[in-house]
């Protein structure tokens, strides 16, 4: 399907609002669009459409806006479960997050949970909006809440002392009732987001990686592997490694084609066929990757943050225990893995999110923040992300 070309001279950043239920995430999202985008009312954002990511249904609202410096895509979720699913599946990638915390309540259970999730799924930076400051008349109390939020962030390895904390009222901004804590605070918040949340490196500037989807042998020319380039650029004549499942091997890309035309290079986002030198048709398989030599290693053991589907979502009807052996679907292939639950966790119920240890039966090209689906016989029963690699 032809889409209109996305032309923009400003850097693009994906962000989202996180925080406890009813602390004002959606009101803040609405307030930002009021000054920086095409205004979206609370109800328009709150009625988030459902979408599917990795076989999981998630309600997510997307808005866009821009500051003089950047263009933003912003995601807001109606329910806590949607946040968990969103962050784990990466349905809406976050380059940074705005943590919304009510000054009247201080940090609450989901404040903590969203910060932990942000840490586990590798959200690089957080900016804090202390909302509802008009409900707190004591300046000392306000300082205490700010301190509490900073300490909470530090306890999850975010730089709590350096993170910008902006105090204001999303409602005051929406109702134009108090400019200082309304409009001024929203403008101050976006200035902080502009300066504190780093611009992500564009996929095309990262080291080359292409998951292999298919392998063909073309008589007289050799072996062709096809797939969509995940990141970076591959030029004809460059050396690459084939990583995962089998021992890592090196080869040279002797041709790149797209839509049956020969190119001198393929780049992030392109669906290409790459002709590789000196590799037999059976020397390479789906589920391996082509990558820049030395950039990615194969691993079997990792810690993961996972969300397990409920029965209603098409998931399991029963809990699972340590030594559970489902398939882990990484990029283009399923690999069986053995799950070990954390100490003190007897079982995992459908609908839970959990940190687990996994050992795959064969090594897979893997990095932190790589996403996967958990499947049983081809049916998705969960989603996860590699939180850290063990070996």
UniProtKB/Swiss-Prot annotation:
Mg(2+) binds at residue 26. It is found in: Cytoplasm. Residues 169-171 are annotated as: G5. PROSITE patterns: G_TR_1, G_TR_2. Residues 19-26 are annotated as: G1. Pfam families: GTP_EFTU, GTP_EFTU_D2, GTP_EFTU_D3. GTP binds at residues 19-26, 76-80, 131-134. GO terms for cellular component: cytosol. Residues 131-134 are annotated as: G4. It catalyses: GTP + H2O = GDP + phosphate + H(+). Residues 10-201 form the tr-type G domain. Keywords: Cytoplasm, Elongation factor, GTP-binding, Hydrolase, Magnesium, Metal-binding, Nucleotide-binding, Protein biosynthesis. One of its GO terms (molecular function) is guanosine tetraphosphate binding. Its EC number is 3.6.5.3. InterPro entries: EF-Tu_GTP-bd (IPR041709), EF-Tu_GTPase (IPR050055), EFTu-like_2 (IPR004161), EFTU_2 (IPR033720), G_TR_CS (IPR031157), P-loop_NTPase (IPR027417), Small_GTP-bd (IPR005225), T_Tr_GTP-bd_dom (IPR000795). Residues 55-59 are annotated as: G2. Residues 76-79 are annotated as: G3. PANTHER family: ELONGATION FACTOR TU, MITOCHONDRIAL, ELONGATION FACTOR TU-RELATED. Monomer. NCBIfam families: EF-Tu, PRK00049.1, PRK12735.1, PRK12736.1, small_GTP. GTP hydrolase that promotes the GTP-dependent binding of aminoacyl-tRNA to the A-site of ribosomes during protein biosynthesis. Belongs to the TRAFAC class translation factor GTPase superfamily. Classic translation factor GTPase family. EF-Tu/EF-1A subfamily. This is Elongation factor Tu 1. The lineage of its organism: Bacteria, Pseudomonadati, Pseudomonadota, Alphaproteobacteria, Hyphomicrobiales.
């Amino acid at each position: 399907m032809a889409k209109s070309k996305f032309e923009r001279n400003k850097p693009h950043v994906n962000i989202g609002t996180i925080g406890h239920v009813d602390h004002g995430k959606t009101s803040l999202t609405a307030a930002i669009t009021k000054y920086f985008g095409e205004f979206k009312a609370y109800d328009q954002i709150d009625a988030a459409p459902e979408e599917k990511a990795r076989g999981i249904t998630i309600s997510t609202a997307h808005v866009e806006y821009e500051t003089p410096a950047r263009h933003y895509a912003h995601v807001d979720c109606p329910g806590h479960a949607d946040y968990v699913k969103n962050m784990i599946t990466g349905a809406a990638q976050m380059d940074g997050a705005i943590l919304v915390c009510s000054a009247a309540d201080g940090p609450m259970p989901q404040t903590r949970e969203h910060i932990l999730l942000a840490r586990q799924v590798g959200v690089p930076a957080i900016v804090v909006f202390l909302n509802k400051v008009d409900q707190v008349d004591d300046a000392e109390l306000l300082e205490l809440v700010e301190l509490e939020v900073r300490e909470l962030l530090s306890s999850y390895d975010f730089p709590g002392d350096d993170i910008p904390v902006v105090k204001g009222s999303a409602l005051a901004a929406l109702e134009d009732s108090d400019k200082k804590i309304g409009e001024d605070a929203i403008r101050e918040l976006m200035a902080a987001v502009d300066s504190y949340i780093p611009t992500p490196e564009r996929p095309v500037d990262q080291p080359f990686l292409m998951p292999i989807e298919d392998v063909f042998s073309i008589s007289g020319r050799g072996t062709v592997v096809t797939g969509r380039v995940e990141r970076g650029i591959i030029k004809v004549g460059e050396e690459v490694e084939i990583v995962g499942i089998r021992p890592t091997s090196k080869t040279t890309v002797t041709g790149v084609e797209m839509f049956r035309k020969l190119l001198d290079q393929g780049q992030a986002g392109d669906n290409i066929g790459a002709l590789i030198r000196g590799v037999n048709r059976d020397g390479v398989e789906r589920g391996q990757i082509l990558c820049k030599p030395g950039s990615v290693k194969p691993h079997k053991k990792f810690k993961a943050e996972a969300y397990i589907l409920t029965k209603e979502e098409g998931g399991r009807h029963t809990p699972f225990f340590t030594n559970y052996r489902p398939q882990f679907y990484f990029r283009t292939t399923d690999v069986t893995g053995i799950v070990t639950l954390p100490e003190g966790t007897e079982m995992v119920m459908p609908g839970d999110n959990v940190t687990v240890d996994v050992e795959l039966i064969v090594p897979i090209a893997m990095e932190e923040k790589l996403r996967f689906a958990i499947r049983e016989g081809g049916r998705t029963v969960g989603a996860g992300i590699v939180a850290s690699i063990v070996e």
